[in-house]
């Protein structure tokens, strides 16, 4: 498994952990990292994804809701919504990652951790977001570099 795939999987698990506990604090992220130690090489990308998603979550969730049909983010399966949050963050803010790579990775992570339908569900929504980004239909407010929240 590649470094970025491992970072994505751990980021999804960390976001899931914080989502289930309704606590997205730096202390909760630290608790996750204490129990599920990200490999050193995966750590920078892992932190970029987690912190980036948390910082941009209102914007990301609004896009997911806008491009899903009759779904509210909070009603989606926890795995699916956090996988999509990561993919949308990558498409909006990680210019070095082609959108199709973000989508394929999201589908694979969704299939691994979600339900039988997760891959198709995730693909349908984030591919619509990708097309809207490519058409210039989405305004992107790019944040400054995301801090690492002092997680060691």
What residue spans do the PLM features occupy?
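N-terminal interaction/assembly modules
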Residues: 1-152
């Amino acid at each position: 498994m590649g470094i970025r795939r491992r970072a994505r999987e751990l980021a999804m698990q960390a976001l899931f952990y914080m989502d289930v506990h309704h606590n997205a604090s730096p202390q909760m992220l630290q608790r996750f990292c204490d129990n599920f130690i990200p490999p050193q090489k995966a750590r920078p990308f892992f932190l970029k994804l987690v912190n980036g998603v948390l910082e941009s979550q209102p914007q990301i969730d609004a896009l997911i809701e806008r491009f899903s049909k009759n779904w509210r983010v909070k009603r989606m399966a926890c795995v699916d919504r956090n996988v999509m949050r990561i993919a949308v963050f990558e498409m909006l803010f990680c210019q070095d990652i082609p959108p199709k790579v973000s989508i394929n990775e999201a589908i694979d992570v969704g299939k691994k951790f979600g339900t039988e339908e997760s891959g198709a569900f995730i693909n349908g929504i984030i591919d619509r977001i990708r097309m809207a980004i490519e058409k210039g239909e989405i305004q992107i407010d790019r944040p400054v570099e995301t801090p690492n929240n002092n997680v060691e």
